[in-house]
Amino acid sequence: MAVAYIQEFPITNRSTENYDFVAEKIGDGPFDGLIAHTAGFDDEAGVFRILDIWESQEHAQRFLDEHVQPLVDQGPAAFPNPDNFTQPTRDGFYELHHAVSGAGAHAISS
């Protein structure tokens, strides 16, 4: 079942330095089960939001455990902007009823 994974971080400044550091370390994939990845500022909500769509929660959790968590576990000192290293205020999954991806218009419905 397709799921969305969302993280939101309060906007303290408009720096993406730590996000860019993680993205560079992880690379561009391909990652098993990833359908789409987005990241950007939602000024109205006051957050920097990461939103991924995965084929399943298991795919997402495997990716997080293998690629993201080892970097986060190193702590703020490992990041280029340690003063801007914060925990997300929102971090979780939700089941998707329907999703459509890019050029091939690949639809996923529950």
Task: List each language-model region with its residue ranges.
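Short S/T/G/P-rich N-terminal loop/turn motif that feeds into the first structured element of a domain
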Residues: M1-D73, A77-S110
